[in-house]
């Protein structure tokens, strides 16, 4: 069958493509840049932006399934930029699916869509979107997710996946940022360091996307129009971070900063960044980051296991062993 994927050159996207190719499917990747590696694999690559609705429609014609993994992911930025990419871009994806009669859409969401200002311990998919979000990224993803869920009908079956803190070889986001901050002496434990989270090895995340597609084909009445949490946990966040740091021959993070101070500092940084129009950078702290680094956020994954047949094949210790030291 023919699969179309946005963000195919990204961390998760490449792993989804590998698994699709292993199963014998044809793959078209739609990304903002060309990736020679994908072309060597025999993947058809289209260079395009999610805002280019006509190119998105023409290039996804005659495909059987659409994996939408691309999004603007950042801890800070202009609200309109998040909205343009994550919401308008997803609307363009939905139109392309509808116009081209693509029957299955798998949307990569995030657990952050339900994270507000308090801990989540084993919450399931009945959790509502929070009234107030401290993340422009999470807010835009929640809006997009809701649109994908509502688009599910007899012509197009949709499912949303919420993978949490994906890690593994090839990661250019999570682990590199942690290591860079630590090398500069800027990484501190926020709160008491006992908070627990979900993490997820990238190959397990990719497998869930393939299984979600198969579930849409085989039992659309059960899976269609639903969201599913994905994770391997809970684990203590700072213990996990220190395992990664140790693997890179660096000393552990030991210094702490109280949550309230970090949260207020994040608020000040956001305020002054907004005032001077500084958006395209990685701020040392935001309110959302302070919350994420200090609070529990782990979820119940039983629905993904029951409905999708998803069971993580690679455990966390094995996943950590697969990390490439750079």
What are these regions (language model features)?
Residues 88, 92-136:
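Conserved Rossmann-fold NAD(P)-dependent oxidoreductase catalytic core, especially the SDR/UDP-sugar
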């Amino acid at each position: 069958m023919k699969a179309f994927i946005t963000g195919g050159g990204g961390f998760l996207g490449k792993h989804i493509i590998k698994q699709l190719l292993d199963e014998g499917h044809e793959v078209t990747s739609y990304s903002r840049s060309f990736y020679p590696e994908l072309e060597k694999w025999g993947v058809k690559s289209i260079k395009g932006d999610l805002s280019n609705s006509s190119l998105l429609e023409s290039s996804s014609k005659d495909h059987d399934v659409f994996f939408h993994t691309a999004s603007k992911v950042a801890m800070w930025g202009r609200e309109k930029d998040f909205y343009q990419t994550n919401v308008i871009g997803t609307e363009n994806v939905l139109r392309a699916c509808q116009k081209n009669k693509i029957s299955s859409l798998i949307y990569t969401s995030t657990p952050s869509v339900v994270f507000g200002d308090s801990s989540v311990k084993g919450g399931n998919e009945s959790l509502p979107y929070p009234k107030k979000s401290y993340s422009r990224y999470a807010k835009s993803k929640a809006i997009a997710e809701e649109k994908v869920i509502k688009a599910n009908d007899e012509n197009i079956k949709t499912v949303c996946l919420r993978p949490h803190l994906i890690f593994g070889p090839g990661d250019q986001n999570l682990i590199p940022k942690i290591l860079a901050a630590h090398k500069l002496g800027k990484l501190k434990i926020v709160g008491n360091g006992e908070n627990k989270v979900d993490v997820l090895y990238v190959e397990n995340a990719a497998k869930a996307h393939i299984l979600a597609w198969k579930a849409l084909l085989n039992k659309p009445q059960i899976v269609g129009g639903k969201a599913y949490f994905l994770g391997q946990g809970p684990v203590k966040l700072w213990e996990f971070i220190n395992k990664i740091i140790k693997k890179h021959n660096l000393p552990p993070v030991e210094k702490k900063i109280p949550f309230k101070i970090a949260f207020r500092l994040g608020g000040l940084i956001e305020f002054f960044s907004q005032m001077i129009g500084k958006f395209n950078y990685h701020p040392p702290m935001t309110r959302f980051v302070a919350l994420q680094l200090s609070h529990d956020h782990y979820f119940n994954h039983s629905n993904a296991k029951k409905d999708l047949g998803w069971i993580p094949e690679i455990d966390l210790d094995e996943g950590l062993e697969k990390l490439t030291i750079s």
